[in-house]
Amino acid sequence: MSNDRDFLGKEPLGKLLLRLAVPTVAAQLINMLYNIVDRIYIGHIPEVGALALTGVGVCMPLILIVSAFAALVGNGGAPRASIALGKGDKDEAEKILGTCFSMQILISLVLTAVLLLWNRNFLLAFGASENTIEYGVSYMNIYSVGTIFVQLTLGMNFFITAQGFAKTGMLSVLIGAISNIVLDPVLIFGFHMGVKGAALATIISQGLSCIWVLSFLFGKKTTLRIRRENMKLKRERVLPTLALGSSVFVMQSSESIIAICFNASLLKYGGDIAVGAMTILTSVMQFAMLPLQGLGQGAQPIISYNYGAGKKDRVKGAFKLLLKSSMLYAALLWIAVMLFPQLFAGMFTSDPALLDFTKTALRIYLAAMFIFGIQMACQLTFMSLGNAKASIVVAVMRKFILLIPLIFIMPAILKINQTMAVYLAEPIADILAVCFTIVLFRREFKKALSKI
């Protein structure tokens, strides 16, 4: 691929979005398998699968925090690097890249220490019971060691995609996903390691992906290269990066807080089976969210570059294509989940009681999935335009102002089935949040275009 990024400002938008989004969506589909394959295998461990799945599910708030910190730096730095490239300032773009690399390493070291020292305490606070705690601790003790691989792979891959090297970014995910899919059954069942084998497979796979990502960004084929002289942490680059990435961090870290709230409420009203079902529900949710993020990542360099280059019509056109594509995907997946919930639930468990419970919960929890496309398209466009404030407002509104209170309010209102009432909080929050986002986006998008 040519190092000339001006194709982002010249090629027809439909062809360009297809060119960039297909690899990123494929990467996210692979990433989806990467994220859920552990749970698929764990849920089918003979005799203890349901409890093991629940125990590992309680680890999700901690895993989401690790991913959130990677996204904080990656989503904060990559759009700023793209905008700098659009303005023709490659030197500044490389300084942003180097700064983000150093930030990822520093954050990963701190997270590793915290997770190794206090994961049991966290898991007990997050909804683990005496039946599931040992499965969670066994998983996290091993997963914590590979935190640096997760940080660098997830966080720095944004910079590969942001330069237009979507296929290279996809390969980084593909390497890890294939490795994980192959290693999981070998370590879980072949070596009888159970959840420890799942965790070990994950960190080995992330390590291989990390090698691929860094070899590219330190190599000669990339437009922006990590250089030693650009690794210094300077206030003028660190703070804007954190500001822009904070919206995604709020979204992902709030998912951790939400998972804790869901687990606590579900454990109270439904016990271990309700918490186990939640693990499956959030896994199925990734079928929607990760491909939608892939579409947004494909559109991000187009929107950011053309915004930096002052090409208003191309910015508007790219957003419209992103919105239509996102809405179509979300609607089709919603239909599939509503018609065949047992198919999705059966991927993660063969336990009859858990399977029957999850089928009902799935239809309730994902009842508003068809509007996810609107929320994600607007959210990712805010970030592509460098609008940190609007992104934060949208994230805070949906998660903190709407969803978390509803998790506790709904079972108090619908006492006939308090467990299912907890799940109902999700679609109600989704609908209200999308209405708010549409109003805010129309105002902020118009304001951003007026500055070009």
Q: What are the language-model segments listed below?
A:
Residues M1-T24, A81-I148, G190-G245, I303-A368, ...:
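Short alpha-helical transmembrane segments in multi-pass integral membrane proteins
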Residues G74, Y143-T161, S172-A177, A198-I211, ...:
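Short runs within selected transmembrane alpha-helices of multi-pass transporters and secretion channels
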Residues L8-V48, P61-G76, R80, I105-T112, ...:
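N-terminal transmembrane alpha-helices
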Residues A50-P61, G136, M140, A199, ...:
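Small-residue hotspots at the loop-to-helix junctions and early N-terminal turns
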Residues V22, D38, G77, W118-N119, ...:
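Hydrophobic/aromatic residues in alpha-helical transmembrane segments
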Residues L29, L33-T54, L123-E130, V186-M193, ...:
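Helix-terminus/linker motif at the lipid-water interface of multi-pass membrane proteins
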Residues L53-A113, V150-G169, A277-P341, F372-S391:
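Small-residue-rich hydrophobic transmembrane alpha-helices
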